Amino acid sequence: MLLGNRPRPQMQRTASITRITIEVDGDQTAGQDSDVSMTVVDGGENYAQRFLSPVNHQRNERKYGGRSSPSSFLVNCGFCKRGLAPGRDIYMYKGDAAFCSIECREQQMEHDEGKTRNRVVLSPSK
């Protein structure tokens, strides 16, 4: 007897969709709307309050002059020092450096790997 190949109990099936009957009015064609309306349910003032962030917005406005300030590393490319344009892709490396292109990111990675290799070679052997 092979392990893991024991017979399994039969899976219980749920109600099939073929057993569900839908009444269709023959008077309308597809795409016609009769008296169909959508109702927007308003939960009142307290409804939306549950989903708001508990951030003190007044303090943030004082700190940043009413606008949000991006982190300093998101302003310029970490390799070529060009400005990072809003709405453009940003390429990250080690979580603390942003780059304008894949090429700049790869060059920084190669530079860091070179520094690591030199550190290993220069360390005294025991």
Curated annotation (Swiss-Prot):
GO terms for biological process: response to glucose; response to mannose; response to sucrose. May act as an adapter to facilitate the interaction of SnRK1 complex with effector proteins, conferring tissue- and stimulus-type specific differences in the SnRK1 regulation pathway. The keyword Zinc applies. The keyword Protein transport does not apply. A zinc finger (FLZ-type) spans 72-116. It comes from Arabidopsis thaliana (Mouse-ear cress). Pfam families: zf-FLZ. InterPro entries: Zf-FLZ_dom (IPR007650). This is FCS-Like Zinc finger 7.
